[in-house]
Amino acid sequence: MTQGKKKKRAANRSIMLAKKIIIKDGGTPQGIGSPSVYHAVIVIFLEFFAWGLLTAPTLVVLHETFPKHTFLMNGLIQGVKGLLSFLSAPLIGALSDVWGRKSFLLLTVFFTCAPIPLMKISPWWYFAVISVSGVFAVTFSVVFAYVADITQEHERSMAYGLVSATFAASLVTSPAIGAYLGRVYGDSLVVVLATAIALLDICFILVAVPESLPEKMRPASWGAPISWEQADPFASLKKVGQDSIVLLICITVFLSYLPEAGQYSSFFLYLRQIMKFSPESVAAFIAVLGILSIIAQTIVLSLLMRSIGNKNTILLGLGFQILQLAWYGFGSEPWMMWAAGAVAAMSSITFPAVSALVSRTADADQQGVVQGMITGIRGLCNGLGPALYGFIFYIFHVELKELPITGTDLGTNTSPQHHFEQNSIIPGPPFLFGACSVLLALLVALFIPEHTNLSLRSSSWRKHCGSHSHPHNTQAPGEAKEPLLQDTNV
């Protein structure tokens, strides 16, 4: 009996210690200083900088592990990860409303970075863990909730923009650094460095990041129930057909983001394998594209919104997306990829413009619901797009015969056609499929009114909206302003 009491006391002490890791006595956030956007920025930068270092090594390991069906397996791996993220993101968001953001920042960063050290230990385990890590690979969702906790509504657009710009900045520099270190010292050093940066990120969250969700905003008990309707990933998608304008916007988003998600997952692999880009050239391409995308989503977007209006900006962005996908599809020379990349950067204005249209036309109490639907559709595309692109590459027999030599200069490369089937007329079939999909999106977007009010008339919608209009769940317009270079694991 005495032994049982001792065990019970030890268990109680462990529970109290776990609570104190996140919240100090009296409910004061633990960490360095008050919660700020800069805490979120550092977390995002370190996580994606670590993954960015592995851009070139991942391409090599992917081909060595799956030499016969590289594109297909890449699509399946990223597709499984995307679908798991889509299914788990609402639940993790709902749980973070109950238990706070810090614990889930720690959880998502840990599991997102868990595959990194496995790259050299066991490639098979590396790709297996990448697939299942999608359950927790939702750092952005938790970070945006963290930012929403500590900012006023009018400040969130700028705060989200800062987070997105930091994400882009990490990808502008890290692939080039990783490619250089890999060429000089070997890929093993790059993996060790990426692992160290991931551990630094975890330590930073444990020691320096204060909890952002006030104690008074949480349920009194750790065992408090969560809203399972809020945790349902299909809840917002079920509401799509209840308003014709919302339906048009969501169809436009689905048809345009499906090929974009597939492109994110495979394009750098395509440059490396089919177009014979060296690791340094891929890194330079990512850097240039990231810089141009930031410029397009800030300066150019602002000018276009003022000069030609919201709807026309969306149409222009879709037009650029069609052009760049067609160019990627038919392009057979490296210089064509660089030229199409500039057009691709311009196409990144589409989703900020879509989000701005929704923000401007939806009622204040419906912002979270409509933005949540768009986010849900994009999450679904993150699962379907990579698998679709991988399958199209597979059925057209676009596969690698041998990797180009590291450090090869693009100006002296032989014809890239030697890297795919000789009877292939179209170098990049999935990109042409994507261009057709975006063309359909453009036709649908023509029917979206420039000035309208998203009056969601269904009483069930109104009831649903009431449960989603919590300030921590509302997605500000800036949340959709993501950089073009979203995928960092390939």
Curated annotation (Swiss-Prot):
Entry's transmembrane regions: 41-61, 75-95, 104-124, 127-147, 161-181, 189-209, 244-264, 285-305, 314-334, 338-358, 380-400, 428-448
Against Gene3D superfamilies, the record matches this protein to: MFS general substrate transporter like domains (1.20.1250.20)
- Carbohydrate-modified residues are 12, 453
Q: Where is this region: Disordered?
A: 465-490
Q: How does it sit in the membrane?
A: Multi-pass membrane protein
User: In this UniProt entry, which residues form the Extracellular topological domain(s)?
Assistant: 1-40, 96-103, 148-160, 210-243, 306-313, 359-379, 449-490
- Pfam families on file: MFS_1
Show which residues sit on the Cytoplasmic side of the membrane. 62-74, 125-126, 182-188, 265-284, 335-337, 401-427
Listed PROSITE patterns: MFS (PS50850), SUGAR_TRANSPORT_1 (PS00216)
The terms describing its cellular component in GO are: membrane
Q: Where's it mainly located?
A: membrane
Keyword annotations: Acetylation, Glycoprotein, Membrane, Transmembrane, Transmembrane helix, Transport
Q: Where in the cell is it found?
A: Membrane
Q: Which GO terms describe its biological process?
A: acrosome assembly; sperm mitochondrion organization; spermatid nucleus differentiation
Q: Which residues carry this modification: N-acetylmethionine?
A: 1
GO MF assignments: transmembrane transporter activity
Q: Does the keyword Glycoprotein apply?
A: yes
SUPFAM superfamilies found in the cross-reference section: MFS general substrate transporter
Family the entry assigns: Belongs to the major facilitator superfamily.
Provide the protein name.
Hippocampus abundant transcript 1 protein
Q: Which organism is it from?
A: Homo sapiens
